[in-house]
A protein has these predicted regions:
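N-terminal Rossmann-like FAD-binding beta1-loop-alpha1 element of flavoenzymes
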Residues: 5-30
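Short hydrophobic core segments
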Residues: 8-10, 184-196, 335
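Active-site substrate-recognition segment that forms the wall
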Residues: 21-22, 50, 73-80, 193-316
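Glycine-rich FAD pyrophosphate-binding loop
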Residues: 24-43
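Dinucleotide-binding Rossmann-like beta1-alpha1 core, especially the glycine-rich loop
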Residues: 47-118, 126-127, 240-241, 278-279
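Helix-loop-beta segment of a Rossmann-like dinucleotide-binding subdomain
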Residues: 75-85, 97, 103, 107-112, ...
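Helical element adjacent to the flavin cofactor pocket in flavoenzyme catalytic cores
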Residues: 131-180, 184-187
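C-terminal catalytic lobe of FAD-dependent flavoproteins
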Residues: 281-362
Length: 362
């Protein structure tokens, strides 16, 4: 073998980088990444925001617990979020406010006039909404670079173009064959491979959990008049769109979840067209042109909660995957939780029980 480590983390996106940063000063850690740069896939394509309602009430503790570190690192910019509904969707709006207000999120219901004051040129049929004033934009690149730098400072090794080719279970751990020809040993193998999480498990002889990737599309568009910087993140209570301002432009998404194989995701023209059509149903402000479009993969376990913990059938295989679209905003708390579980130490304030792999045990 070329080297031996206590822990090998598969994947150098936000999940793998944040976890490695927490582990590096307490174990000998290697992060392996198949691409030629970290964060090429989901992390590098995220239109991330920190909003406590995103992901549902069970994800909320991870988001809330992550807030202080994200603020301390200076990667949050106040934005506010406004979830809106048409005439006839008042009950959905009321249920949204009751659900998230009931778990401690600051929310307030708005009437038509209050919504229109925040969304210029709002069309008449949008009459009800819920404001989350605490929502912020996240500087994803800065956060990811912080974790990579912290991991490096803590002594973590990062090998690029070194995807996992094969994993053999041996007494006391694993013998790993990498795509670059190197072979390494480790005590614990951590699966932080995002859309490839089940594939990594399969290479290790571990039963996949059904973590499935779904494509999400975003388009950057120019509108007339120019989008105001003070515009909040605007979401549909029915889950059909969201949009937010970005340097005088707008980022639009049709909130698509198209099943996909793990891949270098690319946007489909139909999804870009849907995003524009749904935006123009909300605001009387035509899209002049599409300047950029991209897609990323969001990966979910069958119950749409992340998976953090040792595999129930193999105590040397650790799941750190299935973070869906909320992996960025929950990264600090998830890393603390994951490191605590891995090392048998304090995992912070979040209860790990809802996220354990044991819930899928057959």
């Amino acid at each position: 073998m070329d080297a031996r480590f206590d822990i090998v983390v598969v994947g150098a996106g936000m999940a793998g980088a944040s976890l490695a940063a927490r582990l590096g000063d307490r174990a000998r850690v290697l992060v392996i990444e198949a691409e030629d740069r970290p964060g090429y896939h989901a992390t590098g394509r995220s239109a991330a925001f920190w909003t406590e309602s995103y992901g549902g009430p069970l994800v909320k503790p991870l988001t809330t617990a992550s807030g202080p570190e994200l603020h301390r690192l200076g990667v949050l910019t106040p934005r506010g979020a406004l979830t809106i509904g048409r005439m006839g969707q008042e009950r959905q709006i009321a249920a949204f406010a009751e659900t998230y207000g009931g778990v401690g999120i600051e929310v307030s219901t708005l009437n038509r006039a209050e919504i229109a004051a925040r969304i210029p040129d709002l069309k008449a049929e949008w009459t009800c909404g819920v404001l989350e004033p605490s929502t912020c934009d996240i500087d994803v690149a800065a956060l990811h670079q912080h974790y990579l730098a912290a991991a490096r400072k803590a002594g973590v090794d990062l090998w690029l173009r070194a995807g996992l080719a094969a994993a053999e279970r041996i007494p006391g751990g694993w013998a790993l064959a990498l795509a670059d020809g190197r072979r390494v040993g480790c005590d614990v193998l951590v699966d932080a491979a995002g859309a490839w999480a089940d594939a990594v498990a399969g290479k290790a002889g571990v039963h996949p959990l059904g973590i499935a990737p779904y494509r999400r599309t975003i388009a950057q568009v120019a509108v007339e008049p120019v989008a105001p910087d003070a515009l909040p993140l605007v979401l549909d209570v029915g889950g059909r769109f969201y949009f937010k301002p970005e340097s005088g432009r707008l980022w639009l998404s049709p909130h698509d979840e198209t099943p996909s194989s793990p891949c270098d995701a690319a946007p489909e023209e139909i999804d870009v067209a849907l995003a524009i059509d749904r935006f123009e149903q909300v605001v009387d402000r035509p899209v002049l042109r599409v300047e950029h479009r991209w897609a990323g993969l969001r990966s979910f376990a069958p119950d749409r909660l992340p998976v953090y913990g040792f595999d129930p059938q193999d105590g040397a295989f650790f799941w750190f995957a299935g973070q869906g679209g909320f992996g960025i905003q929950t990264a600090p708390a998830a890393a603390v939780l994951g490191a605590g579980l891995l090392l048998g130490q304090d995992g912070g304030e979040v209860d790990p029980w809802p996220f354990g792999a044991r819930r899928f045990q057959r």
